[in-house]
């Protein structure tokens, strides 16, 4: 059975801010664009956490709900909520089959929660996932290094626009959000 998938999510910590950007394309299989304006970046826990997903849409929504529940349970502690979600993800037979990845961030931490329950905090404050993730990551690293005067939001938007120019599964209908 074909699934709805393909997207790019990019996040960066820079100059005291964190920004996250996601495109709006939802693809059915490898041949049909079903939606151009999906919102894959959201605020969670009283607006203090940014979260973005890539992968199967239904699976990602399930993970959003689970992660939001963990944030509430652990009073907004991003790292603890991520660890507890990862534990549950690895142990639960149904969750283990979910095909999605998430980037979550608050002002202090930026984390990747992978499809196999791994949690990764980048050394350089930049993460990208999805079909255009490699392109966005390369652009973001270059901008953060060689254009440090840009803000986190500008880096996130430019990185995702670069990915959209290259990746057929990424479009220019961006949602960009920032925590200062």
UniProtKB/Swiss-Prot annotation:
Concerning Gene3D superfamilies, the annotation shows: Glutamine Phosphoribosylpyrophosphate, subunit 1, domain 1
Residues that, per the record, bind Na(+): 164, 167, 170
Cellular location of this protein? Cytoplasm
Query: By what means is the activity of this protein regulated?
Result: Allosterically activated by HslU binding.
This protein's source sits in the domain of life called: Bacteria
Task: Enumerate the UniProt keywords alphabetically.
Answer: Allosteric enzyme, Cytoplasm, Hydrolase, Metal-binding, Protease, Sodium, Threonine protease
List residues traversing the bilayer.
Answer: none
The EC code for this enzyme is 3.4.25.2
GO MF annotation list: metal ion binding; threonine-type endopeptidase activity
UniProt keyword Cytoplasm, yes or no: yes
Q: Which reaction does it catalyse?
A: ATP-dependent cleavage of peptide bonds with broad specificity
Write out the catalytic residues in the record: 7
Q: Name one GO cellular component term.
A: HslUV protease complex
Q: Name one GO biological process term.
A: proteolysis involved in protein catabolic process
HAMAP family, from UniProt? HslV
| Stored NCBIfam families | ATP_dep_HslV, PRK05456.1
Self-association and partners: A double ring-shaped homohexamer of HslV is capped on each side by a ring-shaped HslU homohexamer. The assembly of the HslU/HslV complex is dependent on binding of ATP.
The role this protein plays is:
Protease subunit of a proteasome-like degradation complex believed to be a general protein degrading machinery.
Similarity remark: Belongs to the peptidase T1B family. HslV subfamily.
This protein's name: ATP-dependent protease subunit HslV
Species of origin reads Brevibacillus brevis (strain 47 / JCM 6285 / NBRC 100599)
Q: Which gene is annotated as encoding this protein in its UniProt record?
A: hslV
């Amino acid at each position: 059975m074909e699934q709805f998938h393909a997207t790019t999510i990019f996040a960066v910590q820079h100059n005291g801010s964190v920004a996250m950007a996601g495109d709006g394309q939802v693809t059915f299989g490898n041949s049909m664009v079903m939606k151009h304006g999906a919102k894959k970046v959201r605020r969670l826990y009283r607006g203090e956490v940014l979260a973005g997903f890539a992968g199967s849409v239904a699976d990602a929504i399930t993970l959003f709900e689970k992660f939001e529940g963990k944030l509430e349970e652990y009073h907004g502690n991003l790292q603890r909520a991520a660890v507890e979600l990862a534990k549950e993800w690895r142990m639960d037979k149904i969750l283990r089959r979910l095909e999605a990845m998430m980037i979550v961030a608050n002002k202090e931490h930026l984390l990747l929660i992978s499809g196999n329950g791994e949690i990764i905090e980048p050394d350089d404050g930049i993460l990208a996932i999805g079909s255009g993730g490699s392109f966005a990551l390369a652009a973001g690293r270059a901008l953060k290094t060689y254009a440090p005067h840009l803000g986190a939001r500008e880096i996130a938007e430019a990185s995702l626009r670069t990915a959209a120019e290259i990746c057929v599964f990424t479009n220019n209908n961006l949602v960009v959000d920032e925590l200062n």
